Amino acid sequence: MVKGIQKISQINEIYTSIYRLIAFFLILLVFYSSIIKAESYAVASRHHIATDIGIKVLEEGGNAIDAAVAVAFALAVVNPSAGNLGGGGFMLIHLAEKTETISIDYRERAPIKSFEKMFQDDSGKIVKGLSLNSIIASGVPGTVSGLFYASEKFGTYDIKDLINPSIELARDGFTLSSFQAKNLNKHKQKFSKNKEAKKIFTRPNGFSKGDILVQKNLANTLERIAQNGKKEFYSGETAKKIANFFQNNGGILSFEDLNQYNLRILNPVCGSYRLYEICSMAPPSSGGIALIQILNILENVDLSSFDHNSEEYLKILISAMDYAYKDRAEYLGDPSFFDVPQNLLTSKKYAKKIYQLIQKEKMPAKATVNILESEETTHFSILDKWGNAVSNTYTLNTAYGSGIIPYGTGILMNNEMDDFSSKPGYPNAYGLIGSEANKIEPKKTPLSSMSPVIVFKNNKPFLITGSPGGSTIITSVLQEILNILDFQYSLKESSKKSRIHFQHLPDILFHEKFEDNLIKSLNKDRKLMNRKLGEIHSILLKKDGLEAFSDKRRPDGKASAIYK
């Protein structure tokens, strides 16, 4: 009996030791997992040099906002077609410690001397090209203001240290890729109209892969900004150079415009979709409202029950896009000038009514308004080891903006005034019809489709994403979200899936590579256009680590995820 008890006791001791050992390893596993999480960070952007600069900032202890500022300044040098000092954009920031998400509107504003009919002749006809390639095509730039605000408010680095790599890149030059060389040559005529742009961005025999692009005046401007701060761009020597150039060449952008520029801190537009929360930009971006509206409509059906990109799946997408873009045109504009019914447009109840109409195959009547912006925009996504996240989209509008560089600055200026309705009820430069909500007014912000997005799961960033692509930004980002949330694709798998785009007007179905029979079944007498759609740069947090990916629809992009 005693021996039996001793044996049981020994067995208990063995089990106790095993349990303790298991507990010990579990503690180690949890501890090790926390270390992995604490050392994880990622950057995805359009240019490999900018991504590398961002990764270095994160490696050396900077946070996501520090890296974002460094990446944005770098893209102004190595991606001159869209990265910029002379443009504007939107930045979405998630602060992990505060569990707070804020957005910065640093988009361009209309100059004080702007007026509704400024791109019309005396007879009321639109003067072709005036809103795109002329001295009056530029809005007041907001990029420098936005980057300084983000750095000063949320960053940890001295901004000089974040700008210095870009100064060196501009002064010493960087190697052009084949794509960049061809793109510069393609826009030679645009640059030829401006003395400094012609000197920097053209060659007698054109650029070739491997050529070095040097931008000394831009380096000098960046150096002054690093030394003197934001005031250098808005009231210092650089501001005077910009204002004097415009005033001396028949422009309307003035020193007063620069001096009075103010960014806006906005509450993001957020909504729930299945088990996730999606946050994006509020107006003057149309992206947040349109995305939430479409997702609300689609939430009424189990998309995962369809085969991906099947006829049934694409039909419901096209219908939801149709309604959202109709509302975008009719109801969205700068909220400082126009009463935007945001709560209505993003409500589940409103989406349910639309879905019921779609079920009855009732499509919205072809309205008389819509807006299209250029495809030349750029996006980057960043996550740091503390869980802070940045999703940023900024632009010059069309490629290289207006093609105008104020003498001595090296700064390409935007042509963002074309994003306004040059004449309500009349087609703009892209063949689309403008709305009263987006008419030109002094100090007003033009409507945009830029849609920086952060998707949350359990109150933590799950997907950080965004894209260039003009009015196709919204639908490109939408399909990235659906691919990942509904179909559980990886970022790489998602990028390989063909995309569609439909925006109510014009009545054209834009599509990538699909089978002919499928496209014909979706046609319904619409015009068809086969083209690349979007250029996604995303970061995805997975159970087993991080995935970062830059869309291969355009070369030169790079995504880096460090998961130690």
Q: Each predicted region: which residue ranges?
A:
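Noncatalytic scaffold domains of N-terminal-nucleophile
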Residues: I36-D52, K56, G62-G229, F233-S235, ...
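Bacterial N-terminal signal peptides
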Residues: I22-S33
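Internal maturation/activation junctions in enzymes
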Residues: V301-T395, T409, P424-G425
